[in-house]
Amino acid sequence: MLQALNLPKKVYFKPGCMPVALRELGDIYRCQRALLVTDPELYRAGIAAPVADRLRKQEIRVAEFFTIGKRVSFGDLRSALPKLSEFQPDVIVGVGGNNAMSAAKALLALYGDPDLDLAAAAADPARIPACAKAKLVLIATNFSSGSQNSPFAILKGEEGQAIVLKSIHLLPEISVTDADFTAGLTAEQVRTCGLKSLSHAVRAYLDPDCTELTAGMLTEAIAAVLKYTERAMNGSPSAREKLHNAAALAGASYGNVVDAITPDLPYFPTGEEITVSDNDVRCAELAERLGFAGCRDFFSACQSV
């Protein structure tokens, strides 16, 4: 049974908070070299650019690593080892959804131990080292997995199968839940993220290891998704902030409730494809049975796109 809440060292969660959060890297941590981990689509769309610009304004050198495909593979991660060795970053910054943030977590682990067997580490989390060479910063650009606050990294194994790492050493020094990054999400993306976030929260809420502390966060997350998804789909910035915070709460909670996640469970963060499954819909129906208000309106909003 859980006896302590394991969370990022510092959690920023207001619109526009990214520059304030990153200021710490120069002012407090005296970082000089940052490895920016992101998805090519986000980079081309300019979504990651404000992060790189902010780092450079603090005279922090920036190198980039781009994830490939919908889930980062062992091979992709291994290909980054020469860059890690040559560039010697003192901070790794993951910007994106679950895929980019999982890649940043795995690279931190490999930076700490380049010989780490990722498949073996998935079976034995004690193998995952604490990395003394770099801090980890995670910046979420959607509200599906809440990975910026969770100890999970979801990777693609040698045979294409999903491999899940979990360790408190994969929690970031700083997590950033800045709703300004969600402004470009379409109504359909908002719907899909809302269903996925609700699925995570409901499954963790029903888990036998859910405690009073995690239940409080999950109750808030479930209620927010049900109440604000329709408004967020219609473009409301304040509603998108609510959903972004709800996903952050869900991620922080299921990371403290669930010992392991597998691809067949609905709270499994599926990466950038973020497809809606029947399990996600069933979890939304479970929320109604649990007595949460607003389920009918939520279903109607989801069916409208």
Specify the residue positions occupied by each region the protein language model found.
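ATP/NTP phosphate-donor binding region
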Residues: 1-91
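Active-site segments that bind and position negatively charged phosphate/pyrophosphate groups
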Residues: 204-278, 282-285, 293, 300
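A glycine/threonine-rich phosphate-anchoring loop and its flanking beta-alpha core
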Residues: 9, 112-212
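Glycine-rich beta-strand-to-loop/alpha-helix junction loops that act as flexible
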Residues: 38-39, 95-97, 233
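Short Gly/Thr/Asp-enriched flexible loops that form oxyanion-binding sites at enzyme active sites
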Residues: 50-51, 80-81, 100-114, 149-152
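Short glycine/serine/threonine-rich phosphate/pyrophosphate-binding segments
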Residues: 18-21, 44-47, 74, 99-104, ...
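N-terminal loops that bind phosphate or other acidic moieties
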Residues: 56, 86, 107, 124-126, ...
